[in-house]
Amino acid sequence: MKLNIAYPTNGTQKMFEIERRNEVRLYDKKIGDQFDGGILGEEFEGTIMEITGGDDYQGFPMVSGHLTKKRVRPLLSKGDAGYRCRRKGVRRRKSVRGSIVSEEICVLNLIILRPGEKEIDGLTNAVNDVSHLPRKEKKLRKMFGVPDEEKNVVGYIRNILKSECDDPKKIPKIRHNGKRMKREQERREQIMKIRLERKRILEEERKEYLEKYFNKA
């Protein structure tokens, strides 16, 4: 079995391969369980890990919520593991693996919650830079001190990073959803305009009805 271990604090990730005698100790554990890494080997002694997922030998992913070692065929929708939704609202019945670890699991995904005293090469002794920045314009402005009168937030931040980073490869990717936010704002304004128009029409109809049958406004 292979272990895909990640350390989110440092942004590192590394693949390990364990022996059969250590692999057996992981059997019957399920997604979300925490354990001492000492059962996997001396290099992980004192490290607290958590199981986050995995794949079997045929590539079917483990899914939490199904307490079984076997495969199941639940009805999946958009956002569920093991199903990529192509059309809006379409649900499919797909095969996925249960959340309990068994001998049929090929790769197991783990994260380090608390490192031990020993340094793990490539995980706890290394730090990877952030690859993406916040997507919200408000957070970007606060992080880099972008003035309110500045309209091109992405360009302003990119100029700051270029002046600070000698190597352009180290500049993190800037994801900005300003266009999407603008479209959402336009959509909300359009909906509000339609509602106000409907309300105005209803008020006029009510007024005409009262004048016609009750002679009062």
Swiss-Prot record:
Phosphorylated. Transmembrane segments: none annotated. One of its GO terms (molecular function) is structural constituent of ribosome. The gene is RPS6. GO terms for cellular component: ribonucleoprotein complex; ribosome. This is Small ribosomal subunit protein eS6. It comes from Encephalitozoon cuniculi (strain GB-M1). The keyword Phosphoprotein applies. PANTHER family: 40S RIBOSOMAL PROTEIN S6. It comes from the Eukaryota. InterPro entries: Ribosomal_eS6, Ribosomal_eS6-like, Ribosomal_eS6_CS. PROSITE patterns: RIBOSOMAL_S6E. Belongs to the eukaryotic ribosomal protein eS6 family. The keyword Phosphoprotein applies. Keywords: Phosphoprotein, Ribonucleoprotein, Ribosomal protein. GO terms for biological process: translation.
